[in-house]
Amino acid sequence: MKALIIGGGVGGLATALTLHVHGIDAEIFEQSPEVKELGVGINTLPHAIKELAELGLLEELQRVGIQTSELTYANRFGQTIWQEPRGLAAGYDYPQFSIHRGKLQTVLHDAVVARMGPVVRTGHRFTRFEQTPDSVTAYFDKDGGEVSAAGDLLIGADGINSTLRAIFFPGEGPPLWDGVVQWRGALIKKPWKTGTEMMVAGPRNRKFIYYPISDDVAEPGKQLVNWTVTIKLAEFGTDMQSSADWSRIGDRELLHKYLQEADFQLGEFDPKSIVDATDQIFEYPRCDRDPLPYWSQGRVTLLGDAAHAMYPVGSNGASQAILDARCLADCLSGSNPVPGAIAAYEDARRPPTTEIVHQNRRSGPEQVIDLVEERAPDGFEHLSDVASDEELRSIIKGYSTMAGFGKDQVNK
């Protein structure tokens, strides 16, 4: 059996590796002329790390990432709303990693090349497909000419702007912007606390996020730290003024203006100083897509952001793509014919990812911040006067269970 995979990102590479474990050949087609380390920091949750560990990648992840030990949600005054251990520190069998997206992609890409050979085809822009009862053929633009490849199934792991998804749903249009713009960057700093903690602070429409993503830096005693500022500028559904990509250079002066208006008071964390100390910042709209009524047609299916693009709250984007990869490989390794296996994969993965998309639109676990802001916009003297531990816990634990990374779910 041979799978054709559109897209050489986290989802596509993880899929190729997982299929390889199950004895299924794969070929990856990436439209970029070369594989480059794009993006800044992301978090990968224990249920996804469990899958990567089973692929033998844990040691490499430990080398390039940070094992997150604690997560704090705070208001804009830096008052703690919720704090909890994460990953191994919380009793999981597998860690949670904060890691540069490009470094994660490189770990996966290097493993693909080492185990499967030169199966990543760069400079191939997917354009269309044809399928018969027995096979599928994908067509690509390569250096201005059309080339094709045949296989037993075609997997669209080509991101939020998926060409394959657009073929399935030609009237869907561009991604949906919720009116939030995100500015992101990374810089070298001394560790905060033990150098393994993550913080999300601010009110509903203005947040500051901070976490380390690597100890592998030239300056002893320092780390590479990722930061994100999110500001709501418009209402949901407003037309975007920029594309939903990873490489748009941010407007530093505009961000300064919004930070002044946001008035974060976070003690040792001064977002403006952190922004000023960052060499390059990126800016992009926060987007998702509406859940689909189906992902598949016969021998062809979608995976990752192409299937279920979601807001980056709750650390679930890349994690869910990795779970997709495992589920699809498991289904294909059974006795079902390929179309039946693909249908089983969709039946297993579409409902939970649909729910995550909806939950992330409601702020996911960050609802604890929103709840406290509604009740105490000017801060609080005692958190218990604003929200009970039980109320906050139900939000946090409800989200982790819904998204499949409750401790009992992962450790079973």
Task: Tell me the role of every PLM-derived stretch.
Residues M1-K412:
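FAD-dependent flavoprotein oxygenase/oxidase catalytic domain
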